[in-house]
UniProtKB/Swiss-Prot annotation:
Lineage, opening ranks: Bacteria, Pseudomonadati, Pseudomonadota, Alphaproteobacteria, Acetobacterales
Keyword Cytoplasm recorded: yes
Family: Belongs to the RimP family.
SUPFAM superfamilies: YhbC-like, C-terminal domain, YhbC-like, N-terminal domain
InterPro entries (alphabetical): Ribosome_maturation_RimP (IPR003728), RimP_C (IPR028998), RimP_C_sf (IPR036847), RimP_N (IPR028989), RimP_N_sf (IPR035956)
The protein's role, per its UniProt record: Required for maturation of 30S ribosomal subunits.
CC annotations in GO: cytosol
Membrane-spanning segments: none
Protein name (Swiss-Prot/TrEMBL): Ribosome maturation factor RimP
Amino acid sequence: MSVAQTPLEQRIAGLIAPGLADMGFELVRVAVLGREQPTVQIMADRADGSLIGIDDCEAISHAAGALLDVEDVIQSTWNLEVSSAGIDRPLTRVKDWVRFAGHLAKVEMSIPGPGGRRRFSGTVLGADETAARLRLDDGEEVSLPMDGLKKAKLVLTDALIDATAQDAGVADSPQQPN
């Protein structure tokens, strides 16, 4: 799995990733949905790992939208959606698999994986350029070829919420009444 699946998504990713990097962001995923009036979905993270906000999404939208207009990548009318990767984010890069080791994920393969299966659920163990590793619920460890991953996404758990809050520096901070 990569940040882009189709040739069009790969072209868009290649165009916008350098500009996002200059702005301090990393591209997590590009998806193009629909045909008549496609929607280009851009998912991004801050390069430093901190959370992105609405203003960041707006800045990314303006920069990416202008570039896509100039390059005329999509000849028809299209929409643009920009978002953060979120807590239950997709795992599209090796660094995502490494960063979220110890958390639960669901994976769908585009090719049969170990045991002929296409769907897996388990604890992320990490990854390298060739394979992502999971410990399944029964304790079996599997190695899934990166180029065979169709979808991989973290599962929302209390542990993931706590880890994300801690990374954002908001863990254990008491709520103040307004």
